[in-house]
Swiss-Prot record:
The gene is spn6. One of its GO terms (cellular component) is prospore septin ring. Belongs to the TRAFAC class TrmE-Era-EngA-EngB-Septin-like GTPase superfamily. Septin GTPase family. It is a peripheral membrane protein. Residues 176-179 are annotated as: G4 motif. It comes from Schizosaccharomyces pombe (strain 972 / ATCC 24843) (Fission yeast). Residues 304-380 form a coiled coil. It is found in: Cytoplasm; Forespore membrane. GO terms for biological process: cytoskeleton-dependent cytokinesis; protein localization; spore membrane bending pathway. Keywords: Coiled coil, Cytoplasm, GTP-binding, Meiosis, Membrane, Nucleotide-binding, Sporulation. InterPro entries: G_SEPTIN_dom, P-loop_NTPase, Septin. Residues 95-98 are annotated as: G3 motif. This is Septin homolog spn6. Septin-like protein involved in the correct orientation of forespore membrane extension during sporulation. SUPFAM superfamilies: P-loop containing nucleoside triphosphate hydrolases.
Length: 380
């Protein structure tokens, strides 16, 4: 499937956001979701499960090997159009293959943060240039960060990455593969992660009661981070009914069973209840903060430098520094050679002068001897 191919998907959206009329009034509604986290956390499977389609191809061993061999992090884009009863949502999903896959993952989140800022920058430039041309909104409305759970909560990489990304996008933490933990273990891990998020002042998205009833908003908020199970396969339960989930020798994990995972809660947050809030908070909070900072810190009309500009300027700076260093070394070598030659000349002159002094002293001695000899001969 082409990454830019638009797919017409007819999905059963149980309930559109409670402020559906506000969405319908728009000529079109765009929702951009970013999937971030280390490989193997189930990002692709989750998205295909959420929208009941193979919007993103499952990664094979060869694909993963190629990504690691590249040793680069990139942002890949897939597009689709969700439609129901004449209501259209232009959906864009962004994947981040290569995130956290290398031995040295220092600042691996910078590529993602720069991409997020670049979308805000494009929107800002359009605001400054013209209001007549329709704006193409490529801003990311929500980032689902797939946490790699460990006994003490989460890895330092996840903590640092989430802390950085939370200032650029609506961040929703997700614990993937929840069926690998027992219920008590999952409860403890959730508590530890919530404590870490609070201690590190990581700003995650909290659903508001303005966009859904109090009970729903409170339930969604208290369930953070969302523990999910993803599967595109149907399994047969003990009673003979079919359900989407995973089958194990000891039982079945169902993705739509709220006692098993938070998949339905996350779906309510993204699609059913708080989609409009994600879009609006991106506009009113995140973008406005970016816009205010940029207009305050730089001259009007001057676009923000992109990564490649910084790289070019840094390369030029390094070239100038190398040239200066080379010229300095050449000058020092020139004067050092001159100094050595002058010292050699000085030593030669001093040696010659010493020889003259020795000859003078020898002549003076001879003169004194002649005077003494002549004096003795005169007395006789």
């Amino acid at each position: 499937m082409s990454l830019t191919e638009n797919l017409q998907l007819l999905l059963n959206l149980d309930s559109l956001p409670s402020k559906r009329e506000n969405l319908i009034k728009r000529k079109e509604c765009g929702l951009t979701i970013m999937l971030c986290g280390a490989s193997g956390t189930g990002k692709t499977t989750f998205f295909n499960t959420l929208f009941a389609t193979s919007l993103q191809p499952e990664k094979s061993y060869e694909t993963a090997k190629e990504t690691i061999a590249k040793k680069t992090l990139e942002v890949k884009k897939n597009k689709a159009v969700i439609e129901e009863d004449g209501f259209h949502i232009n959906l864009t999903v962004l994947d981040t293959p290569g995130f956290g896959d290398f031995i040295d993952n220092t600042s691996c989140w910078n590529t993602v943060a720069e991409y997020l800022d670049e979308q805000h920058e494009r929107y800002l430039i359009h605001d400054q240039n013209s209001l007549r041309v329709p704006r193409k909104d490529t801003r990311v409305h929500v980032c689902l960060y797939f946490i790699t759970p460990v006994s003490f909560g989460m890895l330092p990489l996840d903590v640092l990455a989430m802390k950085e990304l939370s200032t650029h996008v609506n961040l929703v933490p997700v614990i993937a593969k929840a069926d690998t933990f027992t219920t008590p273990e999952l409860t403890q891990i959730k508590q530890k992660i919530r404590r870490i998020l609070e201690a590190q002042s990581i700003d995650v998205f909290h659903p508001s009661t303005e966009y859904s009833d109090y009970e729903t908003a409170e339930l969604l908020d208290s369930s953070l981070p969302y523990a999910i199970i993803s599967s595109v396969n149907e399994v047969c339960k003990d009673d003979g009914e079919k359900s989407q989930g995973r089958r194990y020798p000891w039982g079945t994990s169902e993705i739509y069973e709220e006692t098993h995972c938070d998949f339905l809660k996350l779906k309510k947050l993204l699609i059913n209840r708080h989609m409009l809030e994600l879009i609006n908070t991106t506009e009113t909070n995140i973008y406005e903060r970016y816009r205010r900072e940029q207009l305050t810190n730089r001259k009007s009309g001057i676009p923000k430098l992109k990564k490649e500009h910084y790289e070019r300027l840094n390369n030029e700076k390094r070239a100038i520094q190398q040239k200066i260093t080379q010229m300095t070394n050449e000058t020092e070598s020139f004067f050092q050679a001159k100094e050595e030659k002058m010292i050699e000349t000085r030593d030669a002159l001093n040696s010659e002068l010493s020889e003259y002094h020795e000859r003078i002293r020898a002549l003076e001695t001879q003169i004194e001897s002649l005077k003494s000899y002549k004096g003795r001969g005169h007395k006789k």
